[in-house]
Amino acid sequence: MTVTLDRDPDLGDLVAVVRDRKPVELGDGAREAMAETRAVVEEIVAANDRPVYGVNTGFGDLHDVAIDPADGRQLQRNLLHANTTVGDPLPVEAVRAAMFARAAVFAAGHSGVRPDVVERLLDCLNAGVHPVVGAGGNSDDYGANARIGYVLTGEGEAFYGGERLPGGDALAAAGIDPLSVEPKEALPMMDGPALMTGRLGLAVHDAERLLAAADLAGACTFALLGEQPSAFSPRVAEVRPNEGDAESARVVREALALETETDATVAQDPLSIRTIPQINGSAREALANARPVAATELGAPGDNPLVFPDGVVLSCGGFNGQHVSAAADALARALVKVGHAAERRVHLYVQGRGESPPFVAGDPGLESGLVRAHYSAASLVREAGTLASASDRNSVVSAGQEDVQSLGTVATDHLATTVEKIRAAVAVELLCAVEVRRLTDAAVPGAAGAVVDGVVDRLDATDRSVQIETVARLVADGTVTDLAREAGLDLP
C-alpha cells in the first residue's frame, strides 16, 4: 500500500509511513496547489517591490533589514546553518514523524515551496535516510526542522543503512540528489510544529491502545479482587454524563459480562478499583481532545508567512504549537493518574487481597512473587509524574521579537516518555492478573479472561523484567486489544 500525500492526511497515514514504513508519494492535487503559491513567491522575488518576511528580509528582530534578491539563496542557506540542536540523537521514529508532518504541511499548498522540496523529503522517508537531530536545545521545532532541511541540501549528518554518515554521503548512497534551496524555502523547512505534531499523533495512537488495555487490566483486577460491581453501572453515567467515564465503565462491564445491580455483601471496593471509570475516563477525554488537535495540525498550513494563490501573503502565528503543547501536557497528566491507580491495584494484589496469594507468589516467603515488580511500577509512575508539569510555563526571548514559545517540543517528548512508562505500569497490573490465574486457577470471565489466557500463552520467560517488557509490548502492538476484540468486545 502506498500512502498518497494530498491535502487531507490523517493519523493513520502518519502511523503507516512512520512505523510501518509504507511508501509515500505526493498527490496531484497537492502538487497543483504548491505550484500555484510557488508562482506567487517567484513573482515577489522578481518584482522586489514589497517586503515579504523571509523572502527579501532578515529574520526575527532583523525583519526590517532588506535583503538583495541576489542574496536570496544565501539567505536561506544561512538560516538552515544557524539553527542548532544538542545532545544524543532523537529516535528515528520521531524524526520520521517530523519529516512526514512537514511534508504534509507543505502539501497543503500555503508555504510557497516547490513540489521538489516535498519530493526530496518523501524520497528520504522511502529510502530510510534519517537526519541526525539532537534531542535537546529545540526552541519549539525550529532546530529539529532545520537539521532535517540541512540534510536535504547535502549537509549535516544522517543515518542510512545502519551507519551514521555525512548528509551528502547518505543521500548519495540512497541515490538522492541534494536539494538546492530557493528563496523562501528554508524558512518553511525550519518553521512550524512538525516534530511536535508528528510525535503527538504517534502518542495519540499509542494512548488509545494503552487506555483500552488499562480498562481491560482494571476489569481483570475487579474479577479477581473486587466485590461490588455497582461502580460500573450504566446508571452512574446517566446521572454523571461524562463520556469518558461511561466508555471506561462500559468496557469493564462488557469485558466481564458484569451484572452491576446485585446483592453484593461488600459495600464498596477500594478507590483504585471503584474509580476506574473516572480515572481512565478522564484520560479518555484528554485523549479525545488531543486527537483532533493532532489531526488538524497534521494537515493545516503551519507556516509564516502564509502564501495564497491570489497573491496575498500574510504574516501570522500559524507556526505556533500552543494547541499541541496544551493537548500533550493534559494527556500526559491524565495518563500519570491512570498509572498511579494501576500501581495502587498492584498493591492490592501484593497484599493478598481476593484471589491473590500474598506477594502474588506461589510459595510466599520462599518466593517474592511480584513484589519487586510492584516497586518497579511505583517507580515508573513517579518518574512519569516528574514530567507532568506544564511544559509551556516558560518561554524563550529573542531581542524582544520572538518573545514567546509554545515549548510543544518539550511537551510531546514528555508525553512520549509518559506513555512508555505508564504502559509498563499497566503491564505490571496485567501481569499480576496473569500470575494469579496461573497460580490459583481463579476464573476471569468474558473477553477479559480471553486477554489473560492470551497473555499466558505468549509469556514464555520466567525473568520478571522480561515478562513486564513482553506484556508492555503486547499492549503497544495491539495484541491485548486484539485478543479482547476477537472475544467479542467492542473497543473504541
Q: What feature does the model see in each segment?
A:
Residues 110-135:
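FAD-binding glycine-rich core of flavoenzymes that anchor FAD
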Residues 109-113, 136-144, 199-202, 206:
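Short, well-structured alpha-helical patches and their helix-loop capping segments
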Residues 103-107, 123-130, 157, 216, ...:
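Alpha-helix capping at helix-to-loop junctions
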Residues 14, 79, 94, 98-102, ...:
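Short alpha-helical scaffolding segments that buttress acidic/His motifs in well-ordered protein cores
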Residues 58-59, 104-105, 125, 137-139, ...:
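Acidic, glycine-rich active-site loops and adjacent beta-strand->loop/helix elements
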Residues 53-75, 82-104, 132-155, 163-171, ...:
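FAD-binding core of FAD-dependent oxidoreductases
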Residues 1-22, 26-33, 37-48, 117, ...:
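C-terminal auxiliary extensions adjacent to catalytic cores
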Residues 9-46, 50-55, 59-96, 118:
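Residues that scaffold, gate, or flank divalent-cation-dependent active/transport sites
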